[in-house]
Amino acid sequence: TYDYGLIGNCSFQAHINKNTSIDWMCWPRFDSSFIFGKLLDEENGGAFTLFPHGEIKESHQHYLENTNILCTEITCEEGKYRVIDFAPRFYQFERHFIPFMLIRKIEPLEGAPRIKVCCQPTGSYGQVKPEQYVASNHIEYLGLEKQLRLTTDFPLSYIINNESIVLNETKYIALTY
């Protein structure tokens, strides 16, 4: 079986492992170099993960009915949480908007799971490791084909230092440029 869900909005697509890892995503176009390419290059490919502190006991994915919104539920030693991933596409002012934006909503379901948010994009097919610039509520990844920005209400220091945080409320992450 293929352990990935697929989301996209006709500008880009992302393959999301049932463990929450975005292991394949070309950005900003389908024919661009991947920014997350762990699916093909485990060592240099880069990924965007929302892993629990301990081991994953159970995981499953499903789409919200009649949508391209992917829900991944993770059960771990400390509890259970859900990651909802989607790429917005909407109609407004008599035109279609297809922003280069990936949204991740992380909800605690049971217990007090600790998770690590790890965003490791790459450029030029795994050859470029971008520089990180930390601002008040976002991290910019510089040196890629297009500047990449991760905006979140998670404490940025936990992301930069690859530390676990207790998920006791719903959190959001937006990946944009």
What is each residue range found by the language model?
Residues 2-18, 22-177:
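Beta-sandwich/jelly-roll carbohydrate-recognition scaffolds of carbohydrate-active enzymes
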